[in-house]
Amino acid sequence: MSRFLHGDKGKVMRVIIVGASKVGFALARHITREGYDLVVIDRDPEKVDAITDAFDCNGYVGNGCCSELLRKCGIDSASVFVAVTKDDETNILCCSAAKKLGVKRTIAAVRGPEYEKEMSFLTDKLGVDLLINPDRAAAEVGIKMLRYAETVEREMFGNGAVHLSAVEICGNGVLAGVKLPSVQKVLEAKILICAIDRGGRVFTPSGQDEIKTGDKIVFAAEEADMEKTLNKLRITERRLKKAVIVGASNVGYYMTGILLRRGIKVTVIDNDEGRCRQMLECFPKADVVNGDGTDSELMEKELKGADACVAATSRDEENLVISMFARSFGTDRIAAVIDNIDYETMLKKSGVNHIFSTQDVALIDIIKDVRLLDNGTDETDSSMKWLYALNSGSIEAAEFEVGTDFKLQGILFRDDSFKLKPGILIAVIMRGGSVEIAGGNSKILPGDHVIVVSAEHRILSLADIVG
């Protein structure tokens, strides 16, 4: 396992996590896997033991706001402090204490809608550098999913000049059975396939590989070619007119607000009268129904005329049933909040493709922030500008600005001396105002911005991609 260094070469970057719940546990897995020095704090000794037994890290039982405990954990030498307890106020207070004790970067998870208007105050006055709202972030992810009936992930680089998408190949699709060298001819578009997920095995393809039914492919293209490709794959974006959201949870709250602001009609269903009343007070334009989302008769009635259904209750089991009801009633755009991976598999088999998790969204956002901070301030070969995670984090795409000391600068990609590590591909080169989908005649120069896609490695700088 490699250790990522920060600032002084030879010094491992320390990360402190307060909160050993599901998010804290999953975050600990990622942080230790990436080689950081991790310390975990929680009031529950069993949770602390579970994390320290599972991962290479230190654990302390106690209050993450306590200055004495934070000093014992080495707060003065820590680079990142993350508070992910289930209590918003505790997370804010812990970050404020950590900042006063000298930590470089503080990250707090806050879920309550009441903090939406307090973001600048919390960052400016209370020492919280980054506020992550897992529920709002998940709501935004869910709404992006509803643009298509099919499973599509889509991100943009270079102010929208370059698009990166992940799509699943259907049996009757034009790419099923096509070898990579023939892809552009079949699509009549210039794209580059960067990675393939085949039954959970993620790899960077070669010219000999053939696309198979069920593959999830990640590809890069300029906007016009991306639209042409999606049309060829029969994946079309359709305007949403009406959505049914089951569950007046925080995720349901945020989704309702976003959709209404976009002029989309929203029906909210919840079995708690008090929550229904609150939703109606916050969103008078919404149609709020006090009822049970697992009631098939109610769902059939409310889904008539709806373009999409979102299962956003606080229980995976309910969201599972709601999604299956919606599918059986012919709704083709269905999104469900699911944290249990076993349920995710079951839903996909039943044809429900849009599945998202507040836990996953929070993890990806935190890991991105940690990695960007740790992108070697003294590196001269490159600097990381942006980082995206696709395919549940198994594939990463990072934008780098090329520095003066990049070892492969000026070398044509087809030359034998241009060698990258396995599982890594340079997809796009942006130079001035031009965009180039990378090929054998491409080369990289200082000042270029490049998009690097990785299926096997976690990359901090361009030095990490050289083979």
Model feature map: region roles:
Residues 1-467:
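Cytosolic regulatory regions of ion transport systems
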